[in-house]
């Protein structure tokens, strides 16, 4: 489960969700239901999973971290209440418009700056989990290649994303983060009870499995 968290999460959702809008699980073929779950925004997948988790084992999440102080390294257990996480509402924007700070130049020297990008869905996460685990640079390249819908009249593929400036890539990743929705999980400040060291921990989906 820990080694393939995105697939494990999707499998739980496949089995536990019985209706999406007007579509019930029993009204479609299993492969179609799987596609529907994979096509959910990652934020929606996470929200649904948190609800299922709360119904199954309660609202409390316990996370263990090690104090970063070299002279301490105490294991610290921290409890989080799922109900206390803020929920960011969906803004209703399906295709997010953008204008790159620097722009992409094609082989003819034409500059392209405007386009649209979509939020990542469950299938994107599964592919990134398999293809780019522990390689954040590659993961970001694949993510943008899959999520950018238009960039001028350029056909989007991995090499286009690799040719973007770091400023443009950072801009697009920040844009996606700004348009996230669902549970606002992320970074939390923790103080070691043993030595008083203060540090920041980041929650991710694997912590909830």
Task: Tell me the role of every PLM-derived stretch.
Residues 1-209:
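Short, surface-exposed, charged amphipathic helix/loop patches that serve as local interaction elements
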């Amino acid at each position: 489960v820990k080694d393939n968290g995105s697939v494990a999460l999707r499998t739980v959702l496949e089995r536990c969700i019985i209706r999406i809008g007007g579509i019930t699980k029993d009204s479609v073929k299993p492969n179609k239901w799987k596609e529907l779950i994979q096509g959910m925004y990652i934020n929606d997948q996470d929200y649904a999973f948190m609800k299922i988790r709360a119904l199954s084992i309660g609202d409390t999440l316990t996370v263990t971290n090690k104090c970063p102080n070299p002279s301490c390294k105490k294991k610290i257990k921290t409890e989080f209440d799922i109900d206390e996480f803020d929920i960011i509402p969906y803004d209703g924007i399906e295709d997010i418009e953008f204008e790159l700070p620097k722009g992409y130049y094609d082989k003819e020297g034409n500059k392209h700056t405007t386009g649209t990008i979509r939020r990542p869905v469950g299938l994107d996460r599964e592919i990134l989990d398999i293809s780019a685990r522990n390689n954040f640079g590659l993961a970001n390249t694949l993510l943008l290649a899959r999520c950018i819908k238009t960039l001028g009249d350029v056909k989007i593929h991995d090499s286009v994303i690799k040719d973007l400036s770091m400023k443009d890539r950072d801009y697009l990743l920040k844009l996606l983060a700004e348009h996230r929705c669902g549970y606002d999980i992320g970074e939390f400040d923790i103080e070691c009870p043993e030595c008083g060291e203060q540090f920041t921990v980041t929650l991710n989906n694997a912590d909830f499995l």
